Amino acid sequence: MKVLFASSECAPFFKTGGLGDVAGALPKELAKKSEIDSVAVILPYFKNEMKEEYRSLLKDEFYDFVDVGWRHEYVGVKSLEKEGVKYYFLDNEHYFGRGQLYGYGDDGERFAFFDLALCQLLEKLDFIPDVLHVNDWQTAMVPFLLKEKYNWIKAYEKIKTVLTIHNIEFQGLMHGDALSELFGMGMERYFEGVVRHNGMLNMLKTGILYADRVNTVSPTYAKEIQTSEFGCGLESILQYVDGKVSGILNGIDYDIYNPENDILIPYHFSEEELSGKGQMKAELQKRTGLPLNPNVPLIGMVSRLTNQKGFDLVLSQLEKVLEENVQIVLLGTGFPEIEEGFRYFSQKYPDKLSANIAFDIQFAQEIYAGSDFFLMPSAFEPCGLSQMIAMRYGTLPIVHEIGGLKDTVIPFNPISKEGTGFGFVDFEGQILVETINRALEVYGKEPEVLNKMVLSAMSKDFSWGTKAQQYIELYQEL
């Protein structure tokens, strides 16, 4: 089986979020599986975002021209091979030679070009896949283009398509005329309403309808987006195609996130030998200026500071939490009012709260490794990786039971005394405080139970190898 993975970002070359992590990890794991003959990834060439160590490895394959409306656009194809995966980069200075990946007024046109170029160049690449796996709105038009614009190419007839939705909030909206002016197609599908949604061309909706399978990054999120609360206006479309919608959890890279040999932390530990975790806690207290005390429960937070991540809720209840015997370390940037709120409370409670308004990968690893608990109260969370990383490092998540958080964290059961974290269902301040207090109570009164939970969390398998096998099963169903 040949698989082509199409994405707008991919670690380690360039990424802004979870999509980049998936595009970096999943193809690499697929390449190790006996069912897969070859795997390739196709990406825009964001040269300004790519480190020289990778740019220097690129090989020029060929160039061509793609019609994007009235523009006759150059496209250069570069490639490199890494860990069993061939990566193709589509180069165009006008569209991709910019300072960042997204956030421009012509983003729709930029990815229309990418999707058209991808479809046009498959034959020349000499890589006709059995499965073409596209991701989010940026590549969601590809299944439509294969079936409506390039259906005359015999070599494409047997290609099956999978669309993964990483976050349904972002849908790729353009004026309806874009169908003819950019994609060079007739307007029939727009006027019929197939690709139209609320008076706009909706690229994600188009992909949902035309892909052979649609999946999301957790089973719970696959169900949630079929409701008005989480569907962002596309819930009725997803209900209509419910039979082809499913969810597979993302994984984490166990080579990178390994408490036994993580190069970003000074002390190491394992399920068999946990003493290094206590040393990491002391190191974290030292770094943040919090009192050195092994017996005070320490809650870590590493996140974008936004309402989606639940930090407006946290701020509204933070003083109540800080009145308890607790230490909190926060790392992240985001909404100015949330940043300011944490700064205020860190000045008011300097011995209890360390607010670090920054982005620092090494510091993040120290928080994952040195904390007792990890607070992740997201309002919605398609998958989430932080809770998996925390558990890998023996740090128990405190989560809103939503999306991928619900699928990955087993909430503490006070009867059986089992779980891999603590959870709350109702997104309310008082419930959040009660859940945190429950975790603090177990920490203070039931250390044996807590230790058992830590070991249970560390033993969970969130590796990409397991997830890759689930994707192979999905591909085989096509």
Curated annotation (Swiss-Prot):
Its EC number is 2.4.1.21. InterPro entries: Glyco_trans_1, GS/SS, Starch_synth_cat_dom. Keywords: Glycogen biosynthesis, Glycosyltransferase, Transferase. It is an enzyme of class 2 (transferase). Pfam families: Glyco_transf_5, Glycos_transf_1. GO terms for biological process: glycogen biosynthetic process. It catalyses: [(1->4)-alpha-D-glucosyl](n) + ADP-alpha-D-glucose = [(1->4)-alpha-D-glucosyl](n+1) + ADP + H(+). Pathway: Glycan biosynthesis; glycogen biosynthesis. Belongs to the glycosyltransferase 1 family. Bacterial/plant glycogen synthase subfamily. This is Glycogen synthase. It comes from Lactococcus lactis subsp. lactis (strain IL1403).
